[in-house]
Swiss-Prot record:
Pfam families: MIP. A motif (NPA 1) lies at residues 83-85. Homotetramer; each monomer provides an independent glycerol/water pore. Could also exist in other oligomeric states. One of its GO terms (molecular function) is water channel activity. It comes from Mus musculus. The gene is Aqp3. This is Aquaporin-3. Disulfide bonds: none annotated. Residues 43-56, 122-159, 207-210, 225-242 are extracellular. The lineage of its organism: Eukaryota, Metazoa, Chordata, Craniata, Vertebrata. Disruption phenotype: AQP3 knockout mice have normal perinatal survival, growth, and serum chemistries but are polyuric because of defective urinary concentrating ability. Mice have dry skin with reduced SC (stratum corneum) hydration, decreased elasticity and impaired lipid biosynthesis. The glycerol content of SC and epidermis is reduced, whereas that of dermis and serum is normal. Residues 1-24, 75-78, 93-100, 178-189, 265-292 are cytoplasmic. The record marks 63, 212, 218 as: Selectivity filter. Its main location: membrane. One of its GO terms (cellular component) is nucleoplasm.
């Protein structure tokens, strides 16, 4: 055991990446991969079973818990944004340097692409058998919707843009409230579960129109994968060239979310007064008694 542990420690030292931003990018990639793998995996199960193995609620539950797991995996390293819209909001608030935006976005999109690839491999035979060895983007035998979002037949472009805008703004407002130490901070370690709950609520209330992407990486990465995996360029033209809406609208919605939270909550929160020396002594004494 001793030699094995020593060998593992040496391997860890050799593989350790010293460039912090690269470590963070890898964490974002893996976290987003987990999000897409479990989230789109749940969609695949519902679609390919034609509703016998789940439904709309199970998809929303899966995406909510997938976000939670992705944050738990990557949070300590990168903050687990898992979404370019979240990274954009944090950079806009000067909580993150702007250099992180393109790097995080690329890593998140790559993670989503790889997550879609895993789902495709996992359900490879079922996908091909679903429509007699053909791949359709839309229609009763469409399977591209397993991976990326597409608008419902009733939805026009303006309403769809507003749908993604509001969904992302709501997400950002809630995320900012969760991570704001001067609001009602979530107990440490529960942030991931709370953000997952936010995604679940957005899905169950705003998912009907187009599947609530509210995440450019989660939508574009898998969409690009489907284009390369056999569905072709139709994934970009279906829905009146819908593909750009889940990219542009969430980024604008994230800025709206920042303004709404800051103007109505963030700018008005009062910082707690600094503790006095006497209070610090009392706190230290209480901690000492608890240890005894």
């Amino acid at each position: 055991m001793g030699r094995q542990k020593e060998l593992m420690n040496r391997c860890g030292e050799m593989l350790h990446i010293r460039y912090r931003l690269l470590r963070q990018a890898l964490a974002e990639c893996l976290g987003t991969l987990i999000l897409v793998m479990f989230g789109c995996g749940s969609v695949a199960q519902v679609v390919l079973s034609r509703g016998t193995h789940g439904g709309f609620l199970t998809i929303n539950l899966a995406f909510g818990f997938a976000v939670t797991l992705g944050i738990l995996v990557a949070g300590q390293v990168s903050g687990a944004h898992l979404n370019p819209a979240v990274t954009f909001a944090m950079c806009f608030l000067a909580r993150e340097p702007w250099i992180k935006l393109p790097i995080y976005a690329l890593a998140q999109t790559l993670g989503a692409f790889l997550g879609a690839g895993i789902v495709f491999g996992l359900y490879y035979d079922a996908i091909w058998a679903f429509a007699n060895n053909e791949l359709f983007v839309s229609g009763p035998n469409g399977t591209a919707g397993i991976f990326a979002t597409y608008p419902s037949g009733h939805l026009d472009m303006v309403n769809g843009f507003f749908d993604q805008f509001i969904g992302t703004a709501a997400l950002i407002v809630c995320v900012l409230a969760i991570v704001d130490p001067y609001n009602n901070p979530v107990p440490r370690g529960l942030e991931a579960f709370t953000v997952g709950l936010v995604v679940l609520v957005i899905g169950t209330s705003m998912g009907f129109n187009s599947g609530y992407a509210v995440n450019p990486a989660r939508d574009f990465g898998p969409r690009l994968f489907t284009a390369l995996a056999g569905w072709g360029s139709e994934v970009f033209t279906t829905g009146r060239h819908w593909w750009w809406v889940p990219i542009v609208s969430p980024l604008l919605g994230s800025i709206a979310g920042v303004f709404v939270y800051q103007l109505m909550i963030g700018c008005h929160l009062e910082q707690p007064p600094p503790s006095t020396e006497e209070e610090n002594v009392k706190l230290a004494h209480m901690k000492h008694k608890e240890q005894i």
